[in-house]
Amino acid sequence: MNYFILLFVATFLLLDVNCKKDGYPVDANNCKFECWKNEYCDELCKAKRAESGYCYKLKLSCWCEGLPDDEPTKTSDRCYGTGR
């Protein structure tokens, strides 16, 4: 039984499992991308290797679904360099 568990864990490590996340993508200044149209956000998110994206109208910001874990997303309200 222990060998089965060890083999199972080793298989996952070898497969390099990529996790996905959802969130607001950010630029180099940690600022969200402003938007008006869903098409703009969908293209932006897919360029960042996400599955899809849309314009979240209440915040006028792009929201991406299925972003790779290594892609930065908005974690604070701070936007460096622009005062926003």
Swiss-Prot record:
Intracellular or extracellular location(s): Secreted
Which keywords accompany this UniProt record? Answer: Amidation, Disulfide bond, Ion channel impairing toxin, Neurotoxin, Secreted, Signal, Toxin, Voltage-gated sodium channel impairing toxin
Q: Which residues carry this modification: Threonine amide?
A: 82
Which is an annotated GO molecular function term of this record? toxin activity
InterPro entries per UniProt: LCN-type_CS_alpha_beta_dom, Scorpion_toxin-like, Scorpion_toxin-like_sf, Scorpion_toxinL, Scorpion_toxinL/defensin
What does the tissue specificity note say? Expressed by the venom gland.
Q: Which Pfam families match?
A: Toxin_3 (PF00537)
| Signal peptide limits | 1-19
Q: List the disulfide bonds.
A: 31-79, 35-55, 41-62, 45-64
Q: Which GO terms describe its cellular component?
A: extracellular region
GO annotation terms (biological process): defense response
Which residue range or ranges hold the LCN-type CS-alpha/beta domain? Answer: 21-80
Cite the domain annotation text.
Has the structural arrangement of an alpha-helix connected to antiparallel beta-sheets by disulfide bonds (CS-alpha/beta).
User: What exactly does this protein do?
Assistant: Alpha toxins bind voltage-independently at site-3 of sodium channels (Nav) and inhibit the inactivation of the activated channels, thereby blocking neuronal transmission. Is possibly toxic to mice.
Homology family: Belongs to the long (4 C-C) scorpion toxin superfamily. Sodium channel inhibitor family. Alpha subfamily.
Q: What is this protein called?
A: Beta-toxin Ct16
* Organism from which the protein derives: Centruroides tecomanus (Scorpion)
